[in-house]
A protein has these predicted regions:
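Acidic/polar low-complexity surface segments
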Residues: 2-12, 21, 28-36, 129-143, ...
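Extracellular beta-helix/beta-solenoid repeat scaffolds
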Residues: 1-36, 55-75, 88-152, 156-158, ...
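Short "repeat-start/strand-capping" segments in structured domains, especially the N-termini
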Residues: 156-159, 188-193, 210-216, 234-237, ...
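Acidic Gly/Asp/Thr-rich repetitive segments characteristic of extracellular carbohydrate-active
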Residues: 51-61, 746-779
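Right-handed parallel beta-helix/beta-solenoid
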Residues: 717-766
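Long, low-complexity intrinsically disordered regions enriched in Ser/Thr/Pro/Gly
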Residues: 290-302, 307-315, 320, 334-374, ...
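Short beta-strand-centered aromatic/proline hotspots
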Residues: 73-83
Length: 864
């Protein structure tokens, strides 16, 4: 069905319908799209030493990325001289900021085959902004934010190489982006490569409801909103290789942003489906995150409205290749996996069900590999993951507030984590301290990795997170520390807060003695005093088992081999409680809105006395986790109501019988209620693969109800809501996953001797079109643009508009529309455009409607 109307649209380059195509091939694709500094460039200098012979020329416009924590340290300059075969350029103005340009090496201090060296490369990226083919919005757009936009839809094709898109995008308008595949489904063979998008008012490159697009060697610089934007979750199989995005700015507010995440979660690479390939890309500064792989439960918005993706769950899809990517100078994170943003309110939700899930759609461990990722100068966490599973291999994380915040069942292998490197420029770190691996929900395994630069008073290679659901089964194996005063462990959260119950529920198993010198010992944090808002330490030592010693050089309690540690949690407990261990340590004022949590030592003849500081809830559950099968913990509750019933434990007649019981048991002795929890329910498989700790974690759950009734043994009516039985561990990267580029589908034309020429007045019956005219190119006609021109609009209806490559040409128009198998062409793949060509999209009326019906009956080349 032919297109008959274009409503509320202006300043566009658009192709609609199968067979319609936009072909732009500029000769500047032969230049390097971006490179890095080869040595540091300091403030006041005006010469850049570059890694590559770039092919850049005098007059080219470039941008130098920030290498500090502030993306705003990026700056633009014009080249006035080229030296050393293109490996050095002289700038029109001195630099206003320092830009780091050195590499650093770290070694694990071992010899022979065990030796390992890591290279930290924080050299500034330098990007080419200008190209000889330019598509741009008008100058007024710098005031009103109404630039041009380009789009292909309904089966049209787009092949872009060596082009510059400047002052594009229309601020606050959904769908009005600089470059945009719109609901295209499979576009195998289409690409955007070695092009630049800069000073955009609405994102960079958009892939929307489209699969198998190819983006390579592009630069997206200084945008409002996301840089590389995969829009609805229906985008998969797309390949992004060696692209650079930096200075992605947040929209002013949610109300005015086209989507709310542009204001609250803006990212250089916004990926709403893990089934895409990202290789060698760089995110060099955004107001939120570098890379964010969002967890979508369903395809949303216009893609969902097509009906093509009913029942398709983006977050359940297998990961594509994620390898060799780098992110820095991001206000929050270098890499985020999981979580979700409400695109109406802008609220970021990290919690279930917003986890990357894969598998069978349940909240299980996920098999994926993050390979060779480098993240530095992140204001928050370099790597932030919500969801279980995954392997992080050969990472380099440096100069971040916190290196990792992983949900659990993940491995970190062959990685380097640095608190402060040689590129520590004194930028303030949130909270004032640097932490490496944050120990959180389920077990993490850290192997064959090196830590350096954590020498500040409250710095630590390992730290615990303050929230609940922490694990005592984190493990390290073959980890090493730089001889620079690095602290292995800090008992503080990254923000310096130690006043939550998660502080008391962390354990780190030293499998091979990497930290303690003795294989199998377990580190737990020493907490002697906290502020008292959520918990008060009355008697210290709660986190130390029998025989534990405190090692100040490590910063933690060292528990002897064989110590069994679990986590005890009370849910639905709004009443503060005091917990006293039978050998003396005591916590009081334990309170939270929905649960409390603390560490317990199993099978040590210890009894934990729980005394509610008021009437307990009428119903609460008691869970113990992170224990080997059959391990037990004994609790004594003081003055529970007489009519309290216990679900999940068998009644026994004496305390001795309870002590000897092999299953979960309850014994009442006057006002005291004794509970024995025995871990028999498989929770998850550990990743350690070492006999130093049991490879499986078990749990138990008992429900306490006030209000009468009998004790009901194992009839627990609230099953655990999390299936964590999927084994996790090292995931092998599959080379078969690496994408192969589909053959190009570019379809261009040669200019023929008899083709009509814009400069030929006979084509126009003696009067060339003017600024108020619309040019129509009908089916079978070819119009060659060979001179500068300014018109109100151009409609290519089945014909072709080809820009001749004999001189520099400027074309100004409100819009250029290609329909019904028409073609707009600048250069060809095997013969790129050599001269300068600039298309300026000057339309500035967002309410403009174009009624095409009067044109569809026309033939030939006409002025309308």
């Amino acid at each position: 069905m032919p297109v008959t109307r274009i409503d509320n649209n202006n300043a566009f380059l658009m192709a609609i319908g199968e067979g319609s195509r936009i072909e732009v091939h500029g000769a500047d694709a032969e230049k390097e799209s971006w490179t890095q500094l080869n040595q540091s460039a300091e403030r006041g200098e005006n010469v850049l030493q570059l890694e590559l012979a770039t092919g850049w020329e005098v007059g080219d416009r470039i941008a130098i990325a920030s290498t500090g924590a502030n993306m705003g340290d990026a700056e633009e300059r014009t080249i006035v001289e080229v030296r050393d075969g293109g490996r050095a350029v002289v700038l029109d103005q001195p630099l206003a900021n320092d830009h780091f340009g050195d590499v650093q090496t770290y070694q694990n201090g071992k010899s022979g085959q065990d030796a390992r060296e890591w290279t930290v490369d924080q050299r500034a990226e330098v990007a080419l902004l200008s190209r000889n083919v330019t598509i741009q919005g008008d100058e007024d757009s710098t005031e009103d934010g109404y630039g041009g936009h380009s789009m292909v839809m309904d089966g049209a094709d787009m092949h872009i190489s060596g082009a510059e898109f400047a002052r594009m995008g229309q601020e606050g308008a959904l769908g009005r982006y600089p470059l945009h595949w719109h609901l295209q489904a499979d576009v195998s063979g289409q690409y955007v490569e070695n092009s630049s998008i800069h000073h955009s008012y609405n994102k960079g490159i958009t892939i929307h409801g489209t699969q198998n697009a190819w983006l390579e060697d592009n630069v997206v610089f200084d945008t409002i909103g996301h840089g590389y934007f995969l829009e609805d979750g229906a985008e998969f199989g797309n390949v992004l290789i060696d692209n650079l995005g930096f200075v992605q700015r947040a929209a002013d507010n949610v109300r005015e942003a086209p989507i709310a995440s542009d204001a609250t979660a803006v990212s250089s690479f916004w990926i709403q489906n893990p089934d895409n390939h990202l290789i060698g890309n760089r995110a060099a500064g955004s107001d939120h995150s570098g890379f964010w792989i969002i967890s979508r439960e369903a395809v949303i918005d216009q893609s969902a409205e097509t009906g093509l993706y009913d029942g398709y769950v983006p977050r359940d899809q297998a990961f594509g290749v994620f390898e060799g990517n780098v992110a820095h100078a991001n206000n929050q994170s270098a890499l985020r996996i999981g979580g979700q943003v409400d695109e109406t309110t802008g609220v970021v939700s990290p919690n279930t069900p917003f986890h990357i899930t894969q598998r069978d759609g349940q909240n299980n461990a996920v098999d994926y590999v993050i390979q060779d990722f480098e993240g530095y100068k992140s204001g928050g966490d370099a790597v932030w993951v919500r969801g279980f599973g995954g392997s992080f291999e050969d990472m380099i994380l440096a100069d971040n507030g916190r290196a990792t915040f992983l949900r659990g069942l993940q491995t970190i292998e062959d990685s380097l984590i640095v608190g402060a490197s040689d590129n520590d420029d004194g930028s303030p770190i949130r909270g004032g301290e640097r932490h490496g691996v944050s120990l959180y929900d389920e077990a993490l395994a850290i192997r064959d990795s090196h830590f350096a630069g954590f020498s500040g008073t409250d710095d630590g290679a390992f730290s615990q997170h303050i929230g609940v659901d922490n694990s005592t089964r984190h493990s390290v194996e073959n980890v090493t520390f730089e001889n620079d005063g690095t602290n292995p462990f800090t008992n503080r959260d990254r923000q310096g807060i130690t006043d939550e119950q998660g502080t008391f529920s962390v354990g780190l198993v030293d499998i091979d003695g990497s930290i303690t010198g003795t294989p199998g010992q377990i580190l737990t944090p020493r907490i002697d005093d906290v502020g008292g808002q959520f918990v008060t330490v009355d008697e210290p030592g709660f986190n130390a088992g029998q025989g534990a010693t405190y090692d100040p050089s490590i910063g933690a309690w060292v528990n002897p081999v064989g110590t069994t540690i679990g986590v005890l949690e009370h849910t639905s407990t709004s009443v503060p409680m005091t917990v006293t261990r039978s050998d003396g340590p005591q916590l009081s004022n334990l309170n939270a809105d929905d649960r409390t949590e603390f560490l317990v030592f199993a099978d040590q003849d210890l009894i934990y006395t729980v005394d509610h500081q008021g009437a307990p809830d009428s119903r609460f559950s008691v869970d113990v986790t992170d224990l080997p099968r059959g391990a037990s913990v004994i609790l004594r509750y003081v003055d529970l109501p007489a009519n309290t019933s216990i679900q999940g434990a068998d009644s026994v007649g004496s305390l001795d019988a309870l002590m000897q019981a092999t299953g979960s048991s309850v014994f009442r002795d006057g006002g005291d209620t004794y509970l024995k929890l025995v871990a028999t329910e498989l929770d998850y498989d550990s990743s350690s693969g070492s006999p130093a700790i049991d490879q499986r974690s078990y749990s138990d759950s008992i429900t306490v109800i006030s209000g009468g009734g009998r004790d009901r043994g194992d009839e627990v009516d609230e099953p655990r809501d999390l299936d964590r039985t999927v084994p996790y561990g090292t995931v092998d990267a599959d080379d078969s996953m690496r994408p192969e580029r589909a053959p190009s589908t570019s379809d261009t034309m040669d200019i023929a001797p008899g083709d009509a020429r814009w400069s030929d007045t006979s084509v126009w019956d003696g009067s060339a079109p003017g600024a108020d005219d619309i040019v129509f190119v009908g089916e079978g006609e070819t119009l060659v643009l060979d001179i500068d021109a300014e018109v109100a609009g151009i409609i290519v209806n089945g014909g072709a508009l080809i820009v001749e490559d004999t001189q520099d040409i400027d074309l100004i128009t409100d819009y250029l529309l290609v329909i019904n198998e028409g073609l707009f062409q600048v250069g060809q793949e095997d013969s790129p455009h050599q001269n300068d060509f600039t298309l300026t999209l000057e339309g500035d009326d967002p309410t403009a409607d174009i009624n095409l019906e009067p044109f569809l009956g026309l033939t030939g080349i006409e002025i309308v």
